[in-house]
Regions:
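Structural preference for beta-strand elements that scaffold enzyme active sites
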Residues: 2, 22-23, 51-53, 73-76, ...
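Conserved N-terminal beta1-alpha1 strand-loop-helix module at the mouth
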Residues: 1-52, 57-59, 91, 131, ...
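Alpha-helix-loop-beta-strand connector modules within alpha/beta enzyme cores
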Residues: 35-69, 91-99, 123-126, 173-195, ...
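C-terminal helical cap(s) of enzyme catalytic domains, especially alpha/beta-barrels
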Residues: 41, 83-99, 169, 221-245
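Short beta->alpha connector loops at strand-helix junctions that form conserved
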Residues: 27-29, 56, 77-80, 159, ...
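Glycine/Thr-rich beta-alpha phosphate-binding loop at enzyme active sites
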Residues: 159-176
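Conserved anion-binding
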Residues: 62, 74-151, 161-164
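Catalytic cores of alpha/beta
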Residues: 14-18, 59-73, 77, 82-86, ...
Length: 248
């Protein structure tokens, strides 16, 4: 079970961990988190026992490389619509011979250089870092089997953007979206991929039934909004009850 951080707040991360969330999604596609903040969130989450996933904005080398140096467990690439996009992602994120990741001896991802053998540590990181490609367009769904056949990547499903791409924006349980999602899940399973998904609460049961490996079901902004709404509703009801009893 995972939850997303859309802004930098260590307190939220600790609360999420204590509540039992096991994976922290650090959002850098839509939100304004910096790489320095992302690295801090990785440190904090790791200290609480949570896994971390950074979603970058695109597969430009500087984005992939800086995210990788933060030391997350997962890097997620949105809009991974073509094999070429995915191969470029791998090239930037993996050390040779699997990719062409730039040499940097002291990142958090390599324990700041406190390793017996840097080449061995790089190969260990190659094996441990999960690269997720986000399937969230009709184009990507059509290429699902081809994309899932690429070695060294796992799959993240984006039902919200997928619904828009399929012409039914916001209708994440529409038959078109469900059919596409199930196609992706089957392809991912066939190729031995891990599957993650970001889901609104009403859809959680559907995704749980699909047997996804990581289910993100909330974010910090939504938690603040829902909590504030609940407090306001209860306080307003108390005030209304007081007025009613006074007038009586």
């Amino acid at each position: 079970m995972g939850i997303a951080a859309y802004f930098y707040d260590p307190i939220f991360v600790e609360i999420a961990a204590k509540l039992g969330f096991r994976v922290l999604w650090i959002e850098m596609e839509h939100a304004f988190i910096t790489f320095a903040q992302a690295a801090d969130l990785c440190r904090i989450a790791s200290g609480t026992g949570m896994l971390t996933m950074i979603r970058i904005s695109d597969n430009r080398r500087e984005n992939v490389l800086k995210a990788a140096e933060c030391g997350p467990d997962i890097i997620d690439l949105p809009m991974a619509d073509t094999v070429q996009i995915v191969h470029e992602f791998i090239q930037h994120a993996r050390f040779r011979p699997e990719g062409a990741r730039g040499y940097f001896s002291v990142p958090r991802a390599l324990d700041y250089g406190m390793v017996e053998s840097l080449p061995q540590a790089q190969q260990k990181l190659n094996a441990e870092l999960s690269l997720m490609i986000q399937i969230e367009t009709a184009e990507a769904v059509q290429r699902t089997d081809e994309l899932c056949a690429i070695p060294g990547v796992d799959v993240f499903l984006g039902p919200a953007d997928l619904s828009s791409s399929l012409g039914v924006p916001g209708q994440t349980t529409h038959s078109k979206v469900v059919e596409a999602a199930q196609t992706c899940v089957k392809a991912a399973r066939r190729h031995g991929k891990l599957i993650a998904v970001g889901s609104p609460l009403p859809d959680v049961q559907f995704w749980a039934d699909q047997g996804v490996d990581i289910l993100f079901c909330g974010n910090d902004v939504a938690c603040l909004r829902i909590g504030a709404q609940s407090i306001l509703k209860q306080a307003s009801a108390a005030i209304q009850n007081r007025k009613a009893s006074t007038s009586a």
